[in-house]
Amino acid sequence: MCECKIDRRKLGSLLVCAGSFSLLPGVARAGTVTALAITCIDYRLVDADMRFLDGKHLDHDYDQVSLAGASLAGVSDKFPTSNAAFWDHINISKQLHHIKEVIVLDHRDCGAFKVAFGSDYKGHGAAETAQHKAVMEQVKAKLATTHPDLSSQFYLMALNGKAERVL
């Protein structure tokens, strides 16, 4: 006969714990999300980024990585480690969570764009949009070459949280 002393509480805890193991295969299989969202690190837009993505009906259905400059991180030689991270995260998200789409969310008045472009930075209106669009087009072209199976969307967000689709 066993000399172990297990009271009712411990027995109940053991049964709950043992029962929860049956849920693990389902959790392991639930590793698919629709998209990878690549946003800028700017603290001013963290909440706006989340609201925007949730508004696209992606609530709990996307991976997210934040890199200075968002699209700029994917192609600028000014930030080589961010460049590698940009593409590594697409590869990882695709491998682990089988993403189907990449959503890139730049924003206006971006410090990373100011650093990368220096005196050539276009800070307002249509010129700023065109500068972001040119960078986004480079990312889109590279994405089409490296991951032709992934669709993409590119947005430019104002500091008030309103985003416009650029590509």
Protein language model annotation of sequence segments:
Residues 2-6, 30-34, 43-47, 84, ...:
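Catalytic cores of secreted/periplasmic or lumenal enzymes
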Residues 26-27, 52, 119:
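Residue-level detector of alpha-helical recognition elements and their boundaries
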Residues 2-19, 25:
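N-terminal secretory signal peptides and thylakoid transit peptides that target proteins
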Residues 60-123:
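Short HxH-centered metal-ligating active-site micro-motif
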